[in-house]
Amino acid sequence: MKSNILILFCCFLFLASCQAPSIEEYTLLPHPVDIKYIPGMVKLKTQPTLVYPGELANEALLLQCYLSSDFSVQATLKKNKKKGDIILQLDPAVLPEQAEGYILDATSGNIVLKANSPAGILNAIQTFRQVLKVKDGRLIVQKSTLTDYPVFSWRAVMLDEGRYFKGKEVVFDLLDEMAALKMNVFHWHLTDDQGWRIEIKKYPKLTEIGAWRDSSEIDHFGSNRYDGRRHGGFYTQEEIKEVVDYAAKRNITVIPEIEMPGHASAAIAAYPWLGTS
């Protein structure tokens, strides 16, 4: 009897050892168009090599920075090489109808991010950041092939700084979050009744006067209650250029919003001749 129990127990252990490895499904935002999972994991080196063509220098540098900031992993960049642990690949045959589409291939010993445009590679990089995990000091990825492209060509966020000035660092943080979510249009509301936020050198009073107010209305519109605190600020033309460049490197187009002739009280306070009675 005991020998039979022992045999059954050994059979159970044998069957358990023959089961396929578990698959850890991704939790991604936004969710991709298609994922095909394969049992097993791709394990990258502790200091992986990142290879890329010259046209993807910006994208390679961004990915290197992400690996460092997100996972404390230092990747080595190798330009115009074919073999590496992480490969960025431009190929016009990849989803040719989808300018921002990409394929993330994690089926062998390395990771290949391929697309027909730098914009597609950037989207692949953002997904790659989400699927990566760290185990025993190494980056691992569930084996899979992931295909994705945006459903909407215009994926926008609007920041209203006409009413409340936020500052350049807040804008940079917002652009980073937009890039992570694959959003590609930044509506930048820079003027309104409550403030003028962009330097116009020919009309300096727009920022000397129009960018500042002595107090802000609180509770709700028309409450006639004010906080008594001075508020304001503006962006120089050089700072505007910095933001536009930062956004462009993340496939984000900046659309400045300038209110005229309505919602222009800040401009009229600076130059009364702009108004009518």
Where are these regions (language model features)?
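Feature activates predominantly on carbohydrate-active enzymes
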Residues: 95-277
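Hydrophobic alpha-helical segments and their boundary regions
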Residues: 5-6, 61, 236
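Sec-dependent N-terminal signal peptides
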Residues: 4-15
